[in-house]
């Protein structure tokens, strides 16, 4: 029959569960997988979480029965003594081997899962084994669980030898007590053995007495019993004896001071919140910052006005008027294990990490204290160095991986994070008026590089060339039209410079109204139209090895239906030589290395002039089309701007109405 003692209160959540309280004994337990056991308490049978209780060995429950049979023959006691002496030595050696590997807690740690141990600075843990890298399994205060290995430091062999010597003293005192029980019931002899062995023997004998065995018959049935549990584990059965009603001896009622402090901290923890920052002035003081949560250890320090506490794994004193106490139920849930999941639903364990602090709503803090409490030992303490070399190392990082607990169906936590989501790309710019035709003026006529493909610069309109155009009221005539031509020379080339094509209006000057519109749409409102008085065109010298060719047919499509503008070059900066030529749609390029057959100088010059005039007229039509298009776009932009202004005004009015409504409330 398996029995267990309740260590934590649990309120039943379903009809088939048991409501258990601390100290109660659950009997007829049937162990099941999944974290839930079935047992009986107060005549009622139901389920309860297994991590809220601690199992009691059968040998411990048989002890009270031994008190009822003191009339056994005396010849059994010597035989029991001989067996006891041999078994005690063997088991003491085994215990020494098992307790050979121990570790001491260097940093405090609060459990994040049910199968983890709560560590406090100074606790001694018996290491069971290394389950996973960074996580060990051990026994602390009778509870077996996992703990991070970088929060502890292993003890040297001296502590192991001390534990073995304590076990030897325990066995010797047990033999003396058994001898006393044979003669007079064991009261006087047990007291003598305690006095002879001192406090160590007293503390070692304490667990067996607490379990209600009695003085005279404490080791009567010892050959049948096992003694595998440590002293710390046996001390945890004190609440059981309170329910049974055994009266403890006066010598066993005074536990060790370190364990008293540990138990008091486990049962009730006090926390305080820092309301004013304080920089440590001595080695034994804590540096606290506003908002920190400090665990109180001792309020009754030697110096009045100073408390002892723990923060980030470091213990020290701090002024009590720099903090305020938190209510007793603060972080109450962190001290008790979580409810295990139902047996059918596995639990995915979360990553082990430091506990998140609970941030309270900030309020107006009281005035900072004017002075610190007086410390009597302040003169004796050395002044603290400016560098924090004497501080304890910070709490190490918790290992990222946690082993699977042996008794639950929980899964191991994922080891890697999902890949990071890529950045959202910037959307391409859209044109609001894509249906309107785009006329490319500078693609073929304003760049000065006529042998380049027109598709590479179809969307670029060079308007800077129009700033250098000076309007003229008279038509310009070429000065070489009446000049005799030399025989054997080719006609003027159609190659133009960027400055020569700056103005589309070469021969016909526009009216003042048209001039003004051209200034607004193409010159970016740079200069007034009245300042344009003349137009100057610079034409480059014709090359000797090239002849005039008709324009490329792609110019018409790129320009929105109009032909590409072309003009000739001449040595004079204030004149131009013009000619006419037919448009050939099958011409593959604007210029080629092959020229036309040689013509008469007069005929070729006249043809070039006519061709240039035709192209100038086409340029003017293109400019007019661009003017109309830009006028339409400007009007559309203005209308959209007006609509946006109206929408903004409506939104502003709605915001004002909402503000007034809120103020009225």
UniProtKB/Swiss-Prot annotation:
Residues 469-484, 535-546 have a biased composition (Polar residues). Residues 602-664 form a coiled coil. Keywords: Apoptosis, Cell junction, Coiled coil, Cytoplasm, Cytoplasmic vesicle, Cytoskeleton, Endocytosis, Host-virus interaction, Membrane, Phosphoprotein, Repeat, SH3 domain, SH3-binding, Synapse, Synaptosome, Ubl conjugation. Gene3D superfamilies: SH3 Domains. Monoubiquitinated by CBL and CBLB after EGF stimulation; probably on its C-terminus. Pfam families: SH3_9. SUPFAM superfamilies: SH3-domain (SSF50044). Its main location: cytoplasm. GO terms for cellular component: cell-cell junction; cytoplasm; cytoplasmic vesicle membrane; cytoskeleton; cytosol; endocytic vesicle; focal adhesion; GABA-ergic synapse. Ubiquitously expressed. Also expressed in some cancer cell lines. One of its GO terms (biological process) is cell migration. The modification Phosphothreonine is found at residue 254. The modification Phosphoserine is found at residues 156, 159, 183, 230, 436, 509, 511, 521, 587. Residues 177-195, 491-510, 564-582 have a biased composition (Low complexity). It is linked to Immunodeficiency 61: An X-linked recessive primary immunologic disorder characterized by recurrent infections due to impaired antibody production. Affected individuals have normal numbers of circulating B and T cells, but B cells have an intrinsic defect in antibody production. Disease severity is variable and onset is in early childhood. PANTHER family: SH3 DOMAIN-CONTAINING (PTHR14167), SH3 DOMAIN-CONTAINING KINASE-BINDING PROTEIN 1 (PTHR14167:SF6). Can self-associate and form homotetramers. Interacts with CD2, F-actin capping protein, PIK3R3, GRB2, EGFR, MET, BLNK, MAP3K4, PDCD6IP, SPRY2, ARHGAP17, ARHGAP27, MAGI2, CRK, BCAR1, SOS1, ASAP1, ARAP3, HIP1R, SYNJ2, INPP5D and STAP1. Interacts with E3 ubiquitin-protein ligases CBL and CBLB, but does not interact with CBLC. Two molecules of SH3KBP1 seem to bind through their respective SH3 1 domain to one molecule of CBLB. The interaction with CBL or CBLB and EGFR is increased upon EGF stimulation. The interaction with CBL is attenuated by PDCD6IP. Interacts (via SH3 domains) with ARAP1. (Microbial infection) Interacts (via SH3 domains) with Chikungunya virus non-structural protein 3 (via C-terminus); this interaction plays a role in initiation of viral replication. Adapter protein involved in regulating diverse signal transduction pathways. Involved in the regulation of endocytosis and lysosomal degradation of ligand-induced receptor tyrosine kinases, including EGFR and MET/hepatocyte growth factor receptor, through an association with CBL and endophilins. The association with CBL, and thus the receptor internalization, may be inhibited by an interaction with PDCD6IP and/or SPRY2. Involved in regulation of ligand-dependent endocytosis of the IgE receptor. Attenuates phosphatidylinositol 3-kinase activity by interaction with its regulatory subunit. This is SH3 domain-containing kinase-binding protein 1.
């Amino acid at each position: 029959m398996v029995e267990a003692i309740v260590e934590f209160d649990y309120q039943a959540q379903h009809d088939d569960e048991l409501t258990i309280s601390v100290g109660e004994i659950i009997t007829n337990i049937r162990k099941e997988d999944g974290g839930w056991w079935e047992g009986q308490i107060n005549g009622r049978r139901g389920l309860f979480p297994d991590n809220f209780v601690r199992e009691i060995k059968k040998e411990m429950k048989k002890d009270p029965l031994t008190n009822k049979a003191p009339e056994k023959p005396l010849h059994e006691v010597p035989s029991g003594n001989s067996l006891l002496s041999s078994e005690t030595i063997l088991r003491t050696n085994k215990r020494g081997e098992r307790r050979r590997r121990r570790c001491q807690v260097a940093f405090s740690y609060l459990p994040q899962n049910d199968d983890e141990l709560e560590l406090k600075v100074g606790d001694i843990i018996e290491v069971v084994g290394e389950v996973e890298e960074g996580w060990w399994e051990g026994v602390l205060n009778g509870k077996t669980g996992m703990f991070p290995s970088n929060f502890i430091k292993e003890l040297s062999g001296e502590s192991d030898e001390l534990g073995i010597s304590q076990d030897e003293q325990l066995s010797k005192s047990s033999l003396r007590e058994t001898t006393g029980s044979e003669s007079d019931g064991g009261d006087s002899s047990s007291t003598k053995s305690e006095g002879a062995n001192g406090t160590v023997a007293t503390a070692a004998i304490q667990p067996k007495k607490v379990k209600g065995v009695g003085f005279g018959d404490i080791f009567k049935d010892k050959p049948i019993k096992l003694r595998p549990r440590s002293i710390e584990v046996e001390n945890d059965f004190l609440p059981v004896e309170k329910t049974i009603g055994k009266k403890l001896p006066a010598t066993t009622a005074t536990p060790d001071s370190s364990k008293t402090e540990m138990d008091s901290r486990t049962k009730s923890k006090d926390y305080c919140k820092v309301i004013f920052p304080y920089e440590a002035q001595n080695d034994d003081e804590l540096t606290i910052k506003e908002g920190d949560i400090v665990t109180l250890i001792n309020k009754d320090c030697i110096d009045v006005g100073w408390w002892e506490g723990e923060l980030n794994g470091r213990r020290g004193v701090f002024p009590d008027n720099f903090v305020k106490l938190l209510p007793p139920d603060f972080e109450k849930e962190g001290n008790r294990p979580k409810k295990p999941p139902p047996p059918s639903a596995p639990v995915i364990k979360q990553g082990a990490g430091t506990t998140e602090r609970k941030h309270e709503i900030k309020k107006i803090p009281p005035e900072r204290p004017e002075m610190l409490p007086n410390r009597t030992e302040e003169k004796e303490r050395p002044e603290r160095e400016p560098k924090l070399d004497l501080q304890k190392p910070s709490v190490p990082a918790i290992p990222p991986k946690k082993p699977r607990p042996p008794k639950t169906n929980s899964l191991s936590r994922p080891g890697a994070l999902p890949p990071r989501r890529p950045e959202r790309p910037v959307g391409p710019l859209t044109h609001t008026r894509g249906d309107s035709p785009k006329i490319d003026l500078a693609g073929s006529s304003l760049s000065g590089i006529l042998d380049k493909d027109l598709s590479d610069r179809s969307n670029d309109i060079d308007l800077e060339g129009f700033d250098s155009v000076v309007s003229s009221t008279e038509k310009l005539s070429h000065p070489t039209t009446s000049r005799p031509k030399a025989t054997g020379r080719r006609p003027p080339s159609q190659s133009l410079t960027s400055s020569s094509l700056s103005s589309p209006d070469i021969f016909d000057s526009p009216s003042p109204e048209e001039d003004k519109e051209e200034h607004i749409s193409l010159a970016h409102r740079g200069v007034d139209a009245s300042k344009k008085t003349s137009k100057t065109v610079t034409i480059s010298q014709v090359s000797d090895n090239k002849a005039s060719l008709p324009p490329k047919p792609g110019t018409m499509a790129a320009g929105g239906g109009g032909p590409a503008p072309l003009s000739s070059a001449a040595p004079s900066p204030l004149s131009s030589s013009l000619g006419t030529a037919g448009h050939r749609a099958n011409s593959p390029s604007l210029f080629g290395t092959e020229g036309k057959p040689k013509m008469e100088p007069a005929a070729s010059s006249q043809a070039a002039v006519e061709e240039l005039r035709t192209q100038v007229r086409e340029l003017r039509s293109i400019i007019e089309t661009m003017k109309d298009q830009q006028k339409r776009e400007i009007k559309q932009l203005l209308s959209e701007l007006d609509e946006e202004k109206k929408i903004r005004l409506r939104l502003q009015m709605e915001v004002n109405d909402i503000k007034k409504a809120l103020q009225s409330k």
